[in-house]
Amino acid sequence: MAARLPACVVDCGTGYTKLGYAGNTEPQFIIPSCIAIKESAKVGDQAQRRLMKGVDDLDFHIGDEAIDKPTYATKWPIRHGIVEDWDLMERFMEQVIFKYLRAEPEDHYFLLTEPPLNTPENREYTAEIMFESFNVPGLYIAVQAVLALAASWTSRQVGERTLTGTVIDSGDGVTHVIPVAEGYVIGSCIKHIPIAGRDITYFTQQLLRDREVGIPPEQSLETAKAVKERFSYVCPDLVKEFSKYDTDGAKWIKQYTGVNAVSKKEFSIDVGYERFLGPEIFFHPEFANPDFTQPISEVVDEVIQNCPIDVRRPLYKNIVLSGGSTMFRDFGRRLQRDVKRTVDARLKLSEELSGGRLKPKPIDVQVITHHMQRYAVWFGGSMLASTPEFYQVCHTKKDYEEIGPSICRHNPVFGVMS
């Protein structure tokens, strides 16, 4: 058989879709997961409208091109990680494959990703789109958390390659804490945190709006996003951080310069407390969301405590970060410190309650950071889809035609170096 073309790896997220070919270290494209369509509410006879419908179906844009299209309606087919509008998703995939990857779908196997707790019906819909509309030869739907674990093997902190660990996946729209044992997600213990990149942007926007008058209102969101991505970091201690800024402001306060979209004049703002207060809402959610007050370190601890007792130690030892919102400087260090404090306090308490008769063995808490975090899921998919095993576990077009879309309800785990 001639050399196989590499598989296509597509990771669709709420905010951005990462796409590229297996075997590469980074995605060829990272585009916003949005689609601009013509919404025709024209009055006319049926035949005329049917003709228009056919034309309108081809008249759409995705990604960056879709964001500033004045006569189009911009839609985001994915919310909180889960696909909501399948018709739009099909059209989105069409341009992903033909316009961006420039691939002939009949020639490439595909690895797509799914969020935790995705329904089996959604997998069937995905299979129908890929096999019926695009006629792909093989499809594998991978769980994002497992791919993020595989991506963490690039970190120097990882000794053995294991698919057991706790994945903190924080993107633009949702943050999940997902325990994985031997490549299988422990579904009943997953917790989701209603704080993600978008909330940090909104919170930063609020802080800037209260203080900086010079930002043009229509640009306040993109300014907040740029400030967050460029200057934000996680601090070890809030009170000390405030006093650092108060005593030596010139050293810590940064300047951000933007251009007014209307008048084309430059505007300049000072970025102070916002730098550390933005990401702080992971550790003090009550700053931004009065309904949710549990810090991320407590959520991680609770998730692991809910898991079967024999996997708890490995889960503490391998806490893996994934997604753009975990990229803040010192995020991993602060999380490790906070989880360690919670765990040590519990061990100390059990020792005291036993009157000193029990000496619990200390628990090793390790948060793993690596340079692939931003697109860890995509990179994990790229690694696994370039192994020969991948082609053995893929669901093929032949299976699909014989059995139907239900074959994609289950995707076997592979890639554990056994």
UniProtKB/Swiss-Prot annotation:
Record bears the keyword Nucleotide-binding: yes
UniProt keyword annotations, A-Z: Actin-binding, ATP-binding, Cell projection, Cytoplasm, Cytoskeleton, Nucleotide-binding, Nucleus
Annotated GO CC locations: Arp2/3 protein complex; cell projection; cytoplasm; nucleus; site of double-strand break
GO BP terms, alphabetized: Arp2/3 complex-mediated actin nucleation
The UniProt record lists the keyword Nucleotide-binding: yes
Classification via CDD domains: ASKHA_NBD_Arp3-like
Subcellular location: Cytoplasm, Cytoskeleton; Cell projection; Nucleus
SMART domains: ACTIN
Protein family per UniProt: Belongs to the actin family. ARP3 subfamily.
Role this protein plays: ATP-binding component of the Arp2/3 complex, a multiprotein complex that mediates actin polymerization upon stimulation by nucleation-promoting factor (NPF). The Arp2/3 complex mediates the formation of branched actin networks in the cytoplasm, providing the force for cell motility. Seems to contact the pointed end of the daughter actin filament. In addition to its role in the cytoplasmic cytoskeleton, the Arp2/3 complex also promotes actin polymerization in the nucleus, thereby regulating gene transcription and repair of damaged DNA.
SUBUNIT field: Component of the Arp2/3 complex composed of actr2/arp2, actr3/arp3, arpc1 (arpc1a or arpc1b), arpc2, arpc3, arpc4 and arpc5.
Protein name: Actin-related protein 3-B
Lineage per the UniProt record: Eukaryota, Metazoa, Chordata, Craniata, Vertebrata
